[in-house]
Amino acid sequence: TQMSASDAIFAGFADIYIPKDTWPDLIKKLERSGDCSILDKEPINAGFSQLADHKQLLKTAFASKNLLKIVDFLSRSESKFANSAVNRIKKNCPLAMSYTIEMLSRLSPQSKIEEALDLEYRYTSRAQEYGNFQEGIRAAIIDKDRKPKWKIKINSVSKEMIDEFLKPV
């Protein structure tokens, strides 16, 4: 599932929305002028943001910083958005999802990129050892069945496992 432009802006991954059909003219203007401020002159509304619309639900769900609790909370919701989120979460590697939640809880907006990359490297180097990456590749690219068989289930991911993945290399 791709993130929409409006969700990317809401989440802070993007600053502005530029429709693809305007790119050629905009690129020419930028090449001629070299003035990036033209990007801000006519902001275009990116449309509806599901993340913004469900901000409180997500904030409450992810407050626990524990994948099993997040899935449990979202599963009890009667929201279509929450049910869709649970289905997407369950398709992903439980260990990678848990690690991501832990990494985000260890970092803050004031963290340096080096800190984030260090944590990412720690996990990535160890994920190879446990076969999660290989299983994801098998399901997505080799067999294309889109049905990975994760060795570790959501309910068996422990804090100790995550800490092991994130210890210094």
Say what each PLM segment does:
Residues 3-26:
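Gly/Pro- and small hydrophobic-enriched strand-loop and loop-to-helix capping segments
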Residues 74-80, 89-169:
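Long, low-complexity C-terminal extensions of enzymes
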Residues 18-92, 96:
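Amphipathic alpha-helical blocks and their helix-capping loop/short-beta junctions
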Residues 2, 20, 64, 130-134:
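Residues at alpha-helix boundaries and the short loops/turns that link adjacent helices
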Residues 10, 42, 54, 84, ...:
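Generic preference for well-ordered secondary structure
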